[in-house]
Amino acid sequence: MDTIFALASAPGKSGVAVLRISGSRAFHAGRVLAGGLPDAQRTSLRKLRDSDGSVIDEALVLAFESPNSFTGEDCVEFQTHGSPAIIAALMNELSALPGLRLAQPGEFTRRALENNRMDLAQVEGLADLIEAETEAQRKQALRTFSGELGQKVELWRKDLVRAMALLEVTIDFADEEVPEDVYPEVQELLGRVSQNLAAESAGTHAAERIRHGFEVAILGAPNVGKSSLLNRLAGREAAITSSIAGTTRDVVEVRLDLDGLPVTVLDTAGLRETQDEIEQIGISRAMARAESADLRIILIEDGRLPSGLGVADDDILVQAKSDILPSSSEFAISSVTGRGIDRLVKAVSHRLSLRAASAGTATHVRHRLAISSAVESLDLAKTKISEGFPVELVIEDLRQALVDLESLIGRVGVEQVLDEIFANFCLGK
């Protein structure tokens, strides 16, 4: 297998740059450039030289001996000054060495997966950690990256393997008396796994929302102050405001960090009866996005709801323009003076935080589908046991459930998703 190298830090000028080398010839490459290497898991300050002996830079050099490295292979890292010229010179020297090539996106992590340094869920957690923009995203990604889902899968797997082994006993003793009735223990094991999977499945929606962001739609009649509220929340002129009704015709989105939660606030077209075909399209889009939103803020000006809009239990009704229309409403705001905005934001954050609290460790659609498939197989197995089906058919259902669970951590049937996952990594990962 080729030895690979890449810049592990962000490209461009910086105080420090990190260049990573991994593979069987990593130590040789390190010695060629640095004149020698420190002991494994140690660091030393060395001059890096080109093939003519000229100094390229003075850098911290680290060596990691297989399997105690990120990839599980021999690895060398150079921590250099973050000059593009220095990195280009080092890349040129490494490219000229036999058996070395530039890494593909995510190739270091792919090797870590292949060498069992991490499972597939941890790989996804690492990708999410790199992309995390808010505190909630960081915490969730770190849980996945730390292997929490893999630990759960291993517990579920042990219970299923135990249940299958017990059932196999009844086949082995088909013509003899089975030493003991195994079905009570089998049913207990399957019940426990089913209960755990149901709990994990219940938290997938919240976990996915944390990854992608919650959506909060602002609804109301034209000129009620929806765009003004969006601009106040964004702290900038994200949407055009005008006294002309129907100014907003498409959905305007603003990404916010509300108490660590990723939230996309949607400014929508004013809801009213209109003959304007373009405005009608905008209103239809507004209603569609509002239906799929996690939370709706409904602005009212005269105490009346916009035509055709029903109110859900979790909607937040807000009296707008409180600077000119005094109100005793729980949520009365003025986007001009800022009155009531903090109270509204806290209410939104609180309601979304309650939903986020139910998030599990299964954070991707792939995880949810695999768990759902495993639950379906377990339900079939339990039904067949209760109806007296042949044991072989029950075992086959349990085996399918096991395959579904093992796909969560990349043991089986995930080759088709690897390229998509690793394509989103940078070269140095």
From Swiss-Prot:
It is found in: Cytoplasm. Mg(2+) binds at residues 227, 248. Its EC number is 3.6.-.-. Binds 1 potassium ion per subunit. CDD domains: trmE, TrmE_N. Residues 213-353 form the TrmE-type G domain. K(+) binds at residues 223, 242, 244, 247. (6S)-5-formyl-5,6,7,8-tetrahydrofolate binds at residues 20, 77, 117, 429. Keywords: Cytoplasm, GTP-binding, Hydrolase, Magnesium, Metal-binding, Nucleotide-binding, Potassium, tRNA processing. One of its GO terms (molecular function) is GTPase activity. InterPro entries: G_TrmE (IPR031168), GTP-bd (IPR006073), GTP-bd_TrmE_N (IPR018948), GTPase_MnmE (IPR004520), MnmE_dom2 (IPR027368), MnmE_helical (IPR025867), P-loop_NTPase (IPR027417), Small_GTP-bd (IPR005225). Belongs to the TRAFAC class TrmE-Era-EngA-EngB-Septin-like GTPase superfamily. TrmE GTPase family. Homodimer. Heterotetramer of two MnmE and two MnmG subunits. Exhibits a very high intrinsic GTPase hydrolysis rate. Involved in the addition of a carboxymethylaminomethyl (cmnm) group at the wobble position (U34) of certain tRNAs, forming tRNA-cmnm(5)s(2)U34. This is tRNA modification GTPase MnmE. It comes from Dinoroseobacter shibae (strain DSM 16493 / NCIMB 14021 / DFL 12).
